[in-house]
Amino acid sequence: MFVPRQVKAVANVNIELLDLMYFQNSYNVPYRLKKGGDIEIKPILVKDYPLYEWSMSVLNIKKNEINDIEIIQMSYLDFLVNKLFVQDENELHKLLNIIRLCLGYESVSFDKDKGKICLLLCNKEGIIEKVINSKEFDDIAKIILFQNDFNYDDRYINPDVEAIMQEYSKVKYGDINNPTLEQRKAFVSSKIGKTFSELNEIPYREFDLVYHSALNGEIYIAQKIIQGSYKYDVKEDIKHPLFEKKKDPYSEVFDDPSVLQNKGIQGASQLNTLNFNESQKE
């Protein structure tokens, strides 16, 4: 029987390797702590996704873009505990939700180890079982975000480019309705014959991939029907979305700046002078 090896706390989490070994198979990701042994990072189930979706923002705040040298110099965990949670208790509840759903612990606390903030995972009796330092917290947060979203992307984007991209998405897709999770479950249920109760127990990442696969199949068939109709002149052959080259969401705005220019969006004219690759931090 294949037993995936444990992930050690190293300088950089190898997401590509984790994807091959764990994410694609909906396995828990084992992570070895310096203190407290091992923990398992569990994928989010469909039934828990709404709460996870509300809570996940606490893991990817762009701390280093805040104009405060003290905050920039802090670890992410230190920033959460000593800045964010003091200002907004809801942010603390978000982290507690993430820890319960992904790590399986209901009781947590914070303390210092060698002057640095640590996250303590406790059992029901309040006894400390795991100690997560700031570097390990960063690793675990990164694993959680990639584990539960097939399309998650943590590349650095120049703030000016990102602002233009947000306007681009708002203008181009503003009139498109995003189906609710309930509607997506109904669609998937109609395709694979599983009840809502059965779908609720599927890892969300798996469910989301099935949803988009089924949706793309319908779009492909509809487009092929249009292509075969004498009423429409479709010059290019239509490929199934599964075989199309994956589009870079960050590059799309550079390929089609006219969307923003036609709307008179400020900054659209700058797209020709901005180089996306050079805008990224090494």
Regions found by a protein language model. Name each.
Residues M1-S75, S134-Q227, E282:
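An amphipathic, hydrophobic-aromatic interaction surface with interspersed Lys/Arg
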Residues E70-Q73, F85-L92, E129-F137, N200, ...:
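Intrinsic-disorder-associated interaction segments
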Residues R32-L33, R100, L260-K263:
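Compositionally biased, low-complexity repeat tracts
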Residues F79-N148:
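Long, mid-chain structured domain cores
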